[in-house]
Amino acid sequence: MAKYSSKINKIRTFALSLVFVGFLIMYIGVFFKESIWLSTFFMLLGVLSIGLSTVVYFWIGMLSTKAVRVVCPGCEKETKVLGRVDMCMHCREPLTLDPGLEGKEFDESYNRKKS
């Protein structure tokens, strides 16, 4: 079985990685001290990456406030569900709000709209 995690945690992990990538890009800019334009380019690119992570964190925070809160039957802790199927943030139990999907194997494709 593939390794799944909750959607909120995936997006938060992406935003955190943008912060570290931004710092790495700015660190690369330090090696180009002789060229002011190249150094400035890398510094601005790093700041842009960190700024983008702030936007992503804000977006997932707003999305998180609208998520449905449920109590996980596996660990008895409160967790948030985005979409039709999601994973528990604590124990990674598959969760669904759709009665038609109860008992079925977990698949993230259930959240995609059919064309």
From Swiss-Prot:
Pfam family, one: DUF2614
Keyword field: Cell membrane, Membrane, Transmembrane, Transmembrane helix
Sequence intervals crossing the membrane: 13-33, 41-61
Keyword Transmembrane helix: yes
Membrane topology listed for this record: Multi-pass membrane protein
Cellular-component GO terms for this entry: plasma membrane
Protein's UniProt keywords contain Membrane: yes
Localization annotation: Cell membrane
InterPro entries for the chain: UPF0295 (IPR020912)
Family: Belongs to the UPF0295 family.
Protein name: UPF0295 protein BPUM_0828
Organism: Bacillus pumilus (strain SAFR-032)
Organism placement in taxonomy: Bacteria, Bacillati, Bacillota, Bacilli, Bacillales
